[in-house]
Amino acid sequence: MFLGTHSPRLDDKGRLILPAKFRDELEGGVVMTRGQDRCIYVFTTREFEELHDRMRQAPLASKQARDYMRVFLSGANAETPDKQHRITIPQALRTYAGLDRELAVIGAGSRVEIWDAGTWDEYLTANESAFADTAEEVIPGLF
């Protein structure tokens, strides 16, 4: 499970060093793709394959399902971390997420999310006040 917030920097070649706490789980390979809220989702290869299997259950007759899968899967990129535990984020994904050098890499349970640090700070500021108020509504019986 991925937890916590980390602050690596993007180098000139579009690479970031994976946080130490995430390395063991991600060393076998990752799949990066567009996430909601202009971030990048990073899945283990296994988790992405399971997610894709669930997506394949959606009816092809559904335009919404087709549209979602096209956007989600067309942005996907498989990558294996190098010996220095770095992954290269493709330019298209860096542009999508508006990444600058300063990043926020967060653990989101079954996935990692890569955010531009400024965008992450804005997101937290906008959403922290509603955090306590929405817990019961979003996940009934959680607390």
From Swiss-Prot:
Subcellular location: Cytoplasm, Nucleoid
Gene3D superfamilies recorded: Transcriptional regulator MraZ domain
Gene Ontology CC: one annotated term: cytoplasm
Residue ranges occupied by any SpoVT-AbrB domain in the UniProt entry: 5-47, 76-119
Molecular function (Gene Ontology), one example: DNA-binding transcription factor activity
Major place of residence: cytoplasm
Domain of life: Bacteria
Gene Ontology biological process terms from the UniProt entry: negative regulation of DNA-templated transcription initiation
UniProt key word Cytoplasm: yes
SUPFAM superfamilies with a match to the protein in the record: AbrB/MazE/MraZ-like
InterPro entries: MraZ, MraZ_C, MraZ_dom, MraZ_N, MraZ_sf, SpoVT-AbrB_dom, SpoVT-AbrB_sf
Stated family: Belongs to the MraZ family.
Record-linked NCBIfam families: division/cell wall cluster transcriptional repressor MraZ (TIGR00242)
UniProt-recorded name of the protein: Transcriptional regulator MraZ
